[in-house]
């Protein structure tokens, strides 16, 4: 079992509070792992998180194609820095997770091939992929969603490439198809992540419509 603490890159949510939360979970549930997914941080902050007791960190690489990455992100973000963060996490001692959205804007078959090659070379302990689902408040609101069929197919390929990887059947897959999570498990997924957040606060972390 593992507790996954996931959030945006919010400067109002201090690193000390993250560490306090990790320690509190460890004290109450010493038999469980703690996974963080809080975006790009400095190597020093990653080390603080690890020393507090976090064992795993999920940071999706988003795409293995630098040109595609530039099309998806603001100018101040770079593919090279994302790679630096992933390698810093591994150097710190984390079990590292990466991944990508299926059907994201401007994605091509060549992008997906590069993603699979990157996973084979990086050998992550976790891999999170799910269909792109547009959000009405973003620049990509008019783009079509990714398909469950392609997502499930890629899950099966990743299972063959990385036989021992932790591979979630994601919430997004369950959102886009009524039996999406079941399809994901049958295709090779081996992790289910129920949302333990109170219903009253879930709208504060609305990554896509109908999350």
Which residues does each predicted region cover?
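Conserved strand-turn element in the central/C-terminal portion of the radical SAM core barrel
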Residues: 10-12, 41, 85-110, 128-146, ...
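Short secondary-structure transition/capping segments
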Residues: 15-18, 47-49, 69-73, 109-112, ...
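Auxiliary Fe-S-binding modules of radical SAM enzymes
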Residues: 120-211
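Catalytic cores of alpha/beta
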Residues: 42-51, 105-120, 174-187
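Core AdoMet radical
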Residues: 1-16, 21-86, 95-102, 125-128
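A general structural detector for well-ordered alpha-helical segments in enzyme core domains, enriched
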Residues: 17-25, 45, 81-86, 111-119, ...
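Conserved, mostly hydrophobic/aromatic
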Residues: 5, 59, 89, 119, ...
């Amino acid at each position: 079992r593992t507790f996954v603490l996931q959030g945006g890159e919010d400067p109002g949510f201090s690193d000390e509070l993250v560490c306090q939360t990790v320690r509190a979970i460890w004290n109450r549930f010493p038999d469980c792992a703690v996974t963080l997914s809080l975006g790009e941080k400095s190597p020093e902050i990653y080390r603080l998180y690890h020393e507090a007791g976090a064992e795993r960190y999920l940071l999706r690489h988003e795409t293995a194609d630098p040109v595609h990455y530039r099309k998806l992100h603001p100018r101040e973000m770079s593919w090279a820095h994302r790679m630096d963060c992933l390698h810093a996490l591994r150097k710190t001692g984390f079990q590292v997770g990466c991944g990508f959205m299926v059907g994201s804007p401007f994605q091509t078959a060549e992008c997906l091939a590069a993603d699979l090659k990157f996973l084979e070379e990086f050998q992550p302990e976790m891999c999170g992929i799910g269909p792109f689902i547009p959000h009405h408040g973003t620049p990509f609101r008019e783009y079509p969603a990714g398909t469950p069929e392609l997502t499930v197919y890629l899950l099966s390929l990743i299972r063959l490439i990385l036989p021992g990887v932790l591979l979630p059947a994601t919430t997004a897959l369950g959102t886009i198809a009524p039996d999406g999570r079941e399809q994901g498990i049958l295709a090779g997924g081996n992790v289910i992540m129920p949302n333990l957040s109170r219903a009253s606060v879930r709208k504060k972390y609305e990554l896509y419509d109908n999350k």
